[in-house]
Amino acid sequence: MNMALTLFTNTALASLLVLIAFWLPQLNTYSEKASPYECGFDPMGSARLPFSMKFFLVAITFLLFDLEIALLLPLPWASHTDNLTTMLTMALLLISLLAASLAYEWTEKGLEWTE
């Protein structure tokens, strides 16, 4: 009951904050806020240069793989558990997911810079 109440309270509070942020209007919209700022000087060039989507996708892929590898870090401490088969099954499942996602990225040419 305590856990359910905590989850409900957290969900309700997060939803309330999202709704407030969504429905609150942008009160002060000045042109100065939308202009680029370069240490008080006039901008040398356009601050709205197109961003490389390939770089963005590789960065997101790196973050996902980094998160999955971070999930593997507690495995040495988990090996001291009484239920070793469950731990090994979960570790194998996590490593399989990591290998399958790497294979998918490789076949979709998501790791190549030259294209």
Curated annotation (Swiss-Prot):
One of its GO terms (cellular component) is NADH dehydrogenase complex. Signal peptide: none annotated. Coiled coil: none annotated. GO terms for molecular function: NADH dehydrogenase (ubiquinone) activity. The chain crosses the membrane at residues 4-24, 55-75, 84-104. It is a multi-pass membrane protein. One of its GO terms (biological process) is mitochondrial electron transport, NADH to ubiquinone. It is found in: Mitochondrion inner membrane. Keywords: Electron transport, Membrane, Mitochondrion, Mitochondrion inner membrane, NAD, Respiratory chain, Translocase, Transmembrane, Transmembrane helix, Transport, Ubiquinone. Its EC number is 7.1.1.2. InterPro entries: NADH_UbQ/plastoQ_OxRdtase_su3, NDAH_ubi_oxred_su3_sf. It catalyses: a ubiquinone + NADH + 5 H(+)(in) = a ubiquinol + NAD(+) + 4 H(+)(out). PANTHER family: NADH-UBIQUINONE OXIDOREDUCTASE CHAIN 3. Core subunit of the mitochondrial membrane respiratory chain NADH dehydrogenase (Complex I) which catalyzes electron transfer from NADH through the respiratory chain, using ubiquinone as an electron acceptor. Essential for the catalytic activity of complex I. Belongs to the complex I subunit 3 family. Core subunit of respiratory chain NADH dehydrogenase (Complex I) which is composed of 45 different subunits. Interacts with TMEM186. Interacts with TMEM242. This is NADH-ubiquinone oxidoreductase chain 3. It comes from Phoca vitulina (Harbor seal). The gene is MT-ND3.
